[in-house]
Curated annotation (Swiss-Prot):
Belongs to the eukaryotic ribosomal protein eL37 family. PROSITE patterns: RIBOSOMAL_L37E. This is Large ribosomal subunit protein eL37. Binds to the 23S rRNA. GO terms for molecular function: rRNA binding; structural constituent of ribosome; zinc ion binding. Binds 1 zinc ion per subunit. A zinc finger (C4-type) spans 19-37. Keywords: Metal-binding, Ribonucleoprotein, Ribosomal protein, RNA-binding, rRNA-binding, Zinc, Zinc-finger. Its cofactor is Zn(2+). GO terms for biological process: translation. NCBIfam families: PRK04179.1. GO terms for cellular component: cytosolic large ribosomal subunit.
Length: 56
């Protein structure tokens, strides 16, 4: 039940792969969803207003 250095050696599986839609390496293999574009979760491209800087 250790959570330190000895358990870090067991982390060797791939969590994210290359996305089919956006091409970035942010497609979660376990949940089958892309965290960058939202592929697998929604048909629209994932985009938020807070991603762009404000133009003052």
């Amino acid at each position: 039940m250790s959570k330190g250095t000895s358990s870090m050696g067991k982390r060797q599986k791939r969590t994210h792969a290359k996305c089919r839609r956006c091409g970035s390496v942010s497609f979660n293999v376990h949940t089958k969803q892309c965290t960058s574009c939202g592929f697998g979760k929604t048909s629209r491209i994932r985009a938020y207003k807070w991603q762009a800087k404000c133009k003052y």
